[in-house]
């Protein structure tokens, strides 16, 4: 399609002859494909908000309506729309009024009519570009008698030309279709493979090649497109065109050095130019709606107050401070005008990336045609680059604007050099948050295997691909080439609503989703690391304890007496959860929810405490053998359940023996990370204060968790050699 830039005059010349409706079953006809391409191009132009004008010429129509027709010349060619700005009316015409014809017309005659439209309808208007686009299947007969005149006129009038065909200039097997890219739209492939075209189409294709090579040499063949390729390229709305306007100013360093500069907006957050407005629901005209604002006192009569009797107020806490327009003007900062003053310099490492703010980035160049300014600014840029430093700058757009503080850092390319300015925050712009470190808790500290798995995942998801031959990096996900999906969706919905006022809005187009998905190469590479992540970070259901009702606590039981009621209250009220509803099916301690299974078994006495505890201990040892933090946490839950139930059922000695044996096994297997979690959670021996059957004091329980000092090498040697206590004292 015509390249964006200055104002252009574009003629869309579409073949609507009866052969355009022929197609292979299951594939759209060339007529429908051409219609889609034209629709997409026009809607891009409508929302691009530029000044390009578009005309529409149809050939192969049943009637004839063009200024060159006469006798049997230029028949079945219609100028459907003259040169003017594109709008929704044109889109509606393309959708509903353009229908296949029953005739055929010479595409070279249609080209001459299109040239005539451009030549006559651009008189008195200033266009930088003149362009014709022809959509045809080349099936109609044509005359080559005026071919040289056509080529000469195109060159003389500086009219560029493009052809759009249902096939492409690929290999003989048709595999060269440029529409066969990774984003090719399903069902929009070329209607005819190149090897299946007719002799008439082959002859027409040779004429098209001859014309394009005569106009632009071998590069002219690049201006012959297939419908499928065009649909892929036009599936996104064209970005709104913005022309760069330079901002002249003086870069000052101190009071004696001044450099004339011109700054351009390099990056600016884009906003939709057209805004929402209120119109009459029936006439759809803004003029039919009048808006009137009335101010009234908050009294019973709602007394009207004139606008002149109202001043604004600033709410400060619960008070309102009156602040008139005069006060507001006096409060405003009074500057001398536009400003770009260097406050000082610092190392580039001191300005961290997270401090960049604002909604624009400026590129600062020397003023045009000022050689002294160019030399001075170039010296500053190279000095900053050599010293790895940046300039801290005071920036004010004009005398009405509040000043900013920003950073200007050197930017040197092979064909230009400049300063790049980015705004920096003031104190009030910073948001300070304090978070506790995850390293403080041994419970949540990742293992080495988990860290390596996450590292592998990050490496596999890298969006930069290195080319080993050229030693360069290729960006697999260039965000600067991805259109804003918000704009795409807005334009899609506005277009649909304009053409179909009563139909519901369409779903988001699939190509928009595809643009936002990670590249297929990255997705494939990350599958293996992702599966390892799932293995090393298992999801364990965190069950929330439900509130216990009186009915659930005091349920019917054949045992009578205060002892039975007391036992039921203690056992039922302490650990009730949703899983307890399925207690009847628990016959042993399982590996999925061992702590809860253990509680159910000892509570319902389906197994002896000794048998249930042995099953629980077996699972604890299995979890520890995995040497993985998630299973360590499961073991902690089991130990905690064992301790609580042991106190209830007077089995404190059994738990204490287990915990002592566990400590020895942890030391042998060097599971220091697990024991740190035990110590951190304070899981120790059951003391006689907690259960009367225990002989462990609180001091002994505390000492049990205290870290043990490792004996020195000499001390260990004494015991190995059979030394007694006196020998040990002599060594000390």
UniProtKB/Swiss-Prot annotation:
| Matches recorded under PANTHER family | KU AUTOANTIGEN DNA HELICASE, X-RAY REPAIR CROSS-COMPLEMENTING PROTEIN 5
Q: Where in the cell is it found?
A: Nucleus; Nucleus, Nucleolus; Chromosome
Q: Which GO terms describe its cellular component?
A: chromosome, telomeric region; cytosol; DNA-dependent protein kinase complex; DNA-dependent protein kinase-DNA ligase 4 complex; extracellular region; Ku70:Ku80 complex; membrane; nonhomologous end joining complex
| UniProt modified residues of type Phosphothreonine | 535, 715
Q: Does the keyword Hydrolase apply?
A: yes
Documented EC number(s): 3.6.4.-
**Can you tell me which family this protein belongs to?**
Belongs to the ku80 family.
Q: Which Gene3D superfamilies match?
A: 1.10.1600.10, 2.40.290.10, Ku, C-terminal domain, von Willebrand factor, type A domain
Residues with the Phosphoserine modification: 255, 258, 318, 577, 579-580
The free-text domain note is:
The EEXXXDDL motif is required for the interaction with catalytic subunit PRKDC and its recruitment to sites of DNA damage. The VWFA domain interacts with the KBM (Ku-binding motif) found in a number of DNA repair proteins.
- Specify the protein name: X-ray repair cross-complementing protein 5
Broad class of enzyme this protein falls into:
hydrolase
Q: Gene behind this chain?
A: XRCC5
Q: Where is this motif: EEXXXDL motif?
A: 720-728
């Amino acid at each position: 399609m015509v390249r964006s830039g200055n104002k252009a005059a574009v003629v869309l010349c579409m073949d609507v002859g009866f052969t355009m409706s022929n197609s292979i079953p299951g594939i759209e006809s060339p007529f429908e494909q051409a219609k889609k391409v034209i629709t997409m191009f026009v809607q891009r132009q409508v929302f691009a908000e530029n000044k390009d004008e578009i005309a529409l010429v149809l050939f192969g129509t049943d009637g004839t309506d063009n200024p060159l027709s006469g006798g049997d010349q230029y028949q079945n060619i219609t100028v459907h729309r003259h040169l003017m700005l594109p709008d929704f009316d044109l889109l509606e015409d393309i959708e509903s009024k353009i229908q296949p014809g029953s005739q055929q017309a010479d595409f070279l005659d249609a080209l001459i009519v299109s040239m005539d439209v451009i030549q006559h309808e651009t008189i008195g208007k200033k266009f930088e570009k003149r362009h014709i686009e022809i959509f045809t299947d080349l099936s109609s007969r044509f005359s080559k008698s005026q071919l040289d005149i056509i080529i000469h006129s195109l060159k003389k009038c500086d009219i560029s030309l493009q052809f759009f065909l249902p096939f492409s200039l690929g290999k003989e097997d048709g595999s060269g279709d440029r529409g066969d890219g990774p984003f090719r739209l399903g069902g929009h492939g070329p209607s005819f493979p190149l090897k299946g075209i007719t002799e008439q189409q082959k002859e027409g294709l040779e004429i098209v090649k001859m014309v394009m090579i005569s106009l632009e040499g071998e590069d002219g063949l690049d201006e012959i497109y297939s419908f499928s390729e065009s649909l892929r390229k036009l599936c996104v709305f064209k970005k709104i065109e913005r022309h760069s306007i330079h901002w002249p100013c003086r870069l000052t360093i101190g009071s004696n050095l001044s450099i004339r500069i011109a700054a351009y907006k390099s990056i600016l957050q884009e906003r939709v130019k057209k805004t929402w407005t209120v119109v009459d629901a029936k006439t759809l005209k803004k003029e039919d709606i009048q808006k009137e604002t009335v101010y009234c006192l908050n009294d019973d009569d709602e007394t009207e107050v004139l606008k002149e009797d109202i001043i604004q107020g600033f709410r400060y806490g619960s008070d309102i401070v009156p602040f008139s327009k005069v006060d507001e003007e006096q409060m405003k900062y009074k500057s001398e005008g536009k400003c770009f003053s260097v406050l000082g310099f610092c190392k580039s490492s001191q300005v961290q990336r997270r401090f960049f703010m604002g909604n624009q980035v400026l590129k600062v160049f020397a003023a045009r045609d000022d050689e002294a300014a160019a030399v001075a600014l170039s010296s500053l840029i190279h000095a900053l680059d050599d010293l790895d430093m940046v300039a801290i700058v005071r920036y004010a757009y004009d005398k009405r604007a509040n000043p900013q503080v920003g950073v200007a850092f050197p930017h040197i390319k092979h064909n230009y050099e400049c300063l790049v300015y980015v705004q920096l925050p003031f104190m009030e712009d910073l948001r300070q948050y304090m978070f506790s470190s995850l390293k403080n808790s041994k419970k949540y500290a990742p293992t080495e295997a988990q860290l390596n798995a996450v590292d592998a995942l990050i490496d596999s998801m890298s969006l930069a691909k290195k080319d080993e031959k050229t030693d360069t990096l290729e960006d697999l996900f260039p965000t600067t080439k991805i259109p804003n999906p918000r704009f795409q969706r807005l334009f899609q919905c506005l277009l649909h609503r304009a053409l179909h006022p009563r139909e519901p809005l369409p779903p988001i187009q699939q190509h928009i989703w595809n643009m936002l998905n990670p590249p297929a190469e990255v997705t494939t590479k990350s599958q293996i690391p992702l599966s390892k992540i799932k293995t090393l970070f298992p999801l364990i259901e965190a069950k929330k304890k439900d509130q216990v009702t009186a009915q659930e606590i005091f349920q019917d039981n054949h045992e009578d007496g205060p002892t039975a009621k007391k036992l039921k209250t203690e056992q039922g009220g302490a650990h009730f959860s949703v899983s307890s509803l399925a207690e009847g099916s628990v016959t042993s301690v399982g590996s999925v929810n061992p702590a809860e299974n253990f509680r159910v078994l000892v509570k319902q006495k389906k197994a002896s405490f000794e048998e249930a505890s042995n099953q629980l201990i077996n699972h604890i040892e299995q979890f520890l053998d995995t040497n993985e933090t998630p299973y360590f946490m499961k073991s902690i839950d089991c130990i905690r359940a064992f301790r609580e139930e042991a106190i209830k059922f007077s089995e404190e000695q059994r738990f204490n023996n287990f915990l002592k044996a566990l400590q020895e096994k942890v030391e042998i297997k060097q599971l220091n990370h697990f024991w740190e979690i035990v110590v951190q959670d304070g899981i120790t021996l059951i003391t006689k204060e907690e259960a009367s059957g225990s002989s462990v004091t609180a001091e002994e329980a505390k000492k049990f968790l205290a870290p043990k000092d490792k004996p020195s090498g000499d001390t260990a040697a004494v015991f190995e050699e059979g030394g007694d206590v006196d020998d040990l004292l002599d060594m000390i």
